[in-house]
Curated annotation (Swiss-Prot):
Coiled coil: none annotated. InterPro entries: UPF0178. It holds the Pfam family DUF188. It comes from Cronobacter sakazakii (strain ATCC BAA-894). Belongs to the UPF0178 family. The lineage of its organism: Bacteria, Pseudomonadati, Pseudomonadota, Gammaproteobacteria, Enterobacterales. This is UPF0178 protein ESA_02916. NCBIfam families: PRK00124.1 (NF001095).
């Protein structure tokens, strides 16, 4: 069960956490992006470049992931698709999405899109904090531990 990373928007510090975990646990990590990526030399870490275009990287992740795989993404619609396929979705802030929470997130995302379309400034997310990084690492470790027990 590999880790799939929506790499175009994934913070560098989160990629570094993933790289260390890949080496430590011998878990495949596949970064998917529509631009060239630099990854450390490793038999466990791969970069997959897809053509530029709307949702091309997302569609590649949905096509390739399987039940039980981990997908790291902040993209709510992508998270919803991989959850529907049986994969686990984790955002870079360490929030693990579930079928229940992803519906709520999709509704909020659609509402915010409507506000932005009407000209209301909604602002962006806060900068990634140390607490966010720790939460991400903890959730990643939980998934990796569960993967080990299943093997």
């Amino acid at each position: 069960m590999p880790v799939w990373v929506d790499a175009d928007a994934c913070p560098k510090v989160i990629k570094e956490v993933l790289f260390r975990a890949a080496e430590r646990t011998e878990t495949p990590v596949i970064l998917v992006a529509n631009q060239p990526l630099r990854v450390p030399p490793s038999k466990f870490i791969r970069a997959r470049q897809v053509p530029a275009g709307f949702d091309v990287a997302d569609n590649e992740i949905v096509r390739c992931c399987e039940p039980g795989d981990l997908v790291v993404t902040a993209d709510i619609p992508l998270a919803a698709e991989v959850i529907a396929k049986g994969a686990v979705a984790l955002n870079p802030r360490g929030e693990r999405y579930s079928e229940a929470t992803i519906r709520e997130r999709l509704t909020m995302r659609d509402f915010m899109d409507t506000l932005r379309a009407s000209g209301i400034q909604t602002g962006g997310p806060d900068a990634l904090s140390q607490r966010d990084r720790q939460q991400f690492a903890a959730e990643l470790d939980k998934w990796l531990s569960g993967r080990k027990r299943q093997a």
